[in-house]
């Protein structure tokens, strides 16, 4: 396959010259001249990169140009169907393409049913989100899924039908509009590595239709599955050993990376890619402004590899990006890649995913709390926090999933730890098996033979709030609340978009009742998937309560971020504070600069004045978070778990 850029550009120009008249003849008359001219301009600008991706993936097929024309027709048809308000948003976003880098971006995520019951209930809670300062709302999977096992909504049976318990597709579109009118961008998942085995495509495949069987990866015997598995790593070793499931009705082995009821899609088939383009643009037309791409690492498969992070996976995502840029430029793609940190960063670019979760920062914040040291955190962030211009990390403390220790062995060993032993220590610490631990958590997918495990639990419980309340220890409670605010303070002030897991702002504790539900038994992740307690939330303004102390502290952090232009964009310079317990960085934008210092110890810490000067600080600074002047003649003294956001005195 010819991958020479000059040759591909020439072929793209020639191909568009041939295809554009055919597209125009079919669609131009369905809209006005001004709209069509704008669309044609976007198509002309972004077609070369779409062509390069698709030709590299599928150019050796005899029917390549048929599929190329088909994807352009699908994109154009769905652009024509796009609501006028969203086309207006497209135009606005093209004049401000990096809108998501604003310091006013503050994210939140939730399960609709657990937070508000359904879409209508969520509409009634928009005022709460506005009170908190949220401008980005990620709703966990809302699509139609099988009854019973459905991987928490990630086994999608239809991308166009909603879970009926939440509401209809029309209600979701209405919700998206109302959120947008309140300045909140809707974020949804695009579960595009697999469907459920109850999806219509899977049903058609089960009925024997070869066209739909080609949408998935199916094998008549174990020859190829055995060959693939020799170089692969199992994802869920307990629940689903291997990566294939025998389907007796088909008499075939189906590729099922995650669970037996989740069938992996076959992106080697361009017809499948085109169908998924239609599903993606359908979500865009519902009002989705940020699309989370689920399990990006697993999209492509090749023998004698681990079938993760392959170059073709990046090309598939880049092709989706190009299509969105043509037909729905208001929508931005976000990657979910829980893989080695070096691999995570490879998904991040304006041509692929401008946004990406930062699982390494999350894991290392918890590491720093457990060890009381920032050596690993500082080393890893100095090495890998910088990403391409125009892109941003989505930084979070907790989410719907477990905590995996997603940092590199190199960074941990460089900080003086044995990587394997250190992961074991962290798991023991956060599951309460380590003497002196403040945490209340539970292991997830624990392997007794190797000791490998991930950790479940709510932020407040993991940070010590639950234990302190149990022991009625006010001093321990004060430290625990300080931990919660400290790590949220980092995600609010470091480069990128901060993302709250709703419930953490009122210090929601672990829900141990999940194991009484047979459908949840054995999955400790339900420990941190409790229904939002609106009765506790009523105490959020009462500073004598835990809920009030955490909520008001977080609100101050959010307001600090939104009021200071230094937190615009994503650039962050990680500094060395000269103290192994203090994490330091500087944020700058135009004439605005702030220095952020975080004490990850329950002891008082000092930073030498000489080191402060080396980092660019002056003798007298203003702590924007505390709202007071700070003078450091000889040294700066930080109280336990203190966050300082220092600006020069004007």
Q: Where do the protein language model's features map onto the residues?
A:
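Active-site and adjacent substrate-binding regions of carbohydrate-active enzymes
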Residues: 2-650
């Amino acid at each position: 396959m010819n991958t020479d850029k000059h040759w591909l550009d020439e072929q793209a120009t020639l191909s568009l010259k041939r295809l554009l008249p055919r597209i125009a003849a079919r669609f131009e008359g369905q809209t006005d001249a001004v709209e069509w001219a704008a669309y044609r301009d976007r198509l002309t600008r972004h077609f070369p990169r779409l062509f390069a991706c698709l030709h590299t993936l599928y150019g050796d097929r005899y029917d390549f140009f048929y599929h190329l024309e088909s994807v352009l027709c699908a994109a154009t048809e769905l652009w024509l169907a796009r609501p006028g308000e969203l086309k207006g948003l497209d135009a606005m976003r093209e004049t401000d393409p990096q809108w998501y880098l604003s310091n006013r971006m503050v994210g939140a995520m939730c399960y609709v049913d657990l937070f508000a019951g359904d879409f209508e209930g969520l509409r009634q809670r928009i005022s709460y989100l506005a009170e908190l300062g949220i401008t980005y709302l990620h709703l966990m999977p809302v699509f139609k899924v099988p009854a019973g096992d459905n991987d928490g909504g990630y086994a999608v049976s239809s991308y166009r039908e909603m879970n009926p318990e939440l509401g209809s597709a029309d209600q979701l579109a209405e919700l998206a509009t109302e959120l947008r009118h309140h300045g909140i961008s809707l974020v949804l998942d695009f579960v595009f590595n697999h469907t459920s085995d109850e999806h219509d495509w899977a049903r058609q495949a089960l009925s024997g239709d070869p066209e739909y069987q080609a949408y998935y990866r199916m094998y008549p015997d174990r020859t190829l599955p055995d060959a693939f598995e020799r170089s692969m790593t199992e994802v869920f070793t307990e629940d689903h050993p291997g990566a294939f499931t025998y389907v007796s009705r088909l008499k075939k082995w189906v590729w099922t990376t995650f669970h037996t009821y989740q069938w992996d899609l076959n992106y080697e088939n361009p017809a499948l890619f085109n169908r998924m383009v239609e599903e993606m643009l359908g979500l865009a037309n519902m009002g989705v402004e940020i699309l989370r791409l689920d399990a990006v690492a697993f999209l492509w498969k090749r023998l004698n590899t681990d079938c993760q992070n392959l170059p073709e996976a990046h090309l598939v995502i880049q092709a989706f990006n190009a299509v969105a840029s043509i037909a729905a430029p208001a929508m931005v793609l976000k990657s979910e890649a829980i893989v080695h940190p070096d691999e995570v960063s490879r998904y991040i670019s304006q041509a692929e995913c401008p946004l990406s979760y930062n699982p390494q920062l999350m894991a290392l914040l918890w590491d720093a709390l457990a060890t009381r040291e920032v050596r690993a955190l500082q080393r890893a962030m100095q090495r890998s926090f910088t990403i391409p211009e125009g892109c941003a990390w989505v930084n979070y403390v907790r989410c719907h999933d477990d905590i995996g220790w997603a940092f590199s062995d190199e960074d941990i060993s460089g900080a003086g730890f044995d990587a394997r032993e250190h992961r074991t220590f962290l798991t023991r610490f956060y599951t309460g098996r380590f003497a002196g631990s403040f945490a209340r958590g539970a292991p997830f997918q624990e392997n007794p033979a190797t000791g490998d495990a991930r950790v479940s639990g709510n932020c407040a419980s993991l940070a010590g709030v639950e234990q302190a309340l149990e022991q009625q220890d006010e001093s321990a409670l004060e430290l625990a609340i300080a931990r919660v605010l400290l790590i949220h303070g980092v995600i609010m002030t470091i480069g990128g978009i901060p993302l709250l897991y709703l419930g953490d702002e009122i210090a929601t504790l672990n829900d141990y009742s999940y194991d009484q539900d047979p459908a949840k038994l054995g999955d400790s992740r339900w420990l941190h998937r409790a229904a939002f307690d609106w009765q506790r939330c009523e105490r959020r303004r009462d500073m004598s309560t835990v809920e009030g102390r955490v909520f008001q502290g977080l609100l101050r952090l959010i307001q600090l971020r939104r009021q200071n232009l230094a937190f615009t964009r994503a650039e962050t310079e990680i500094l060395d504070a000269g103290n192994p317990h203090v994490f330091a960085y500087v944020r700058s934008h135009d004439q605005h600069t702030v220095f952020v210092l975080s004490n990850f110890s329950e002891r008082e810490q000092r930073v030498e004045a000489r080191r402060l000067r080396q980092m660019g600080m002056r003798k007298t600074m203003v702590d924007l978070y505390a709202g007071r002047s700070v003078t450091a003649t000889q040294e700066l003294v930080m109280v336990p778990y203190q966050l300082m956001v220092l600006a020069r005195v004007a």
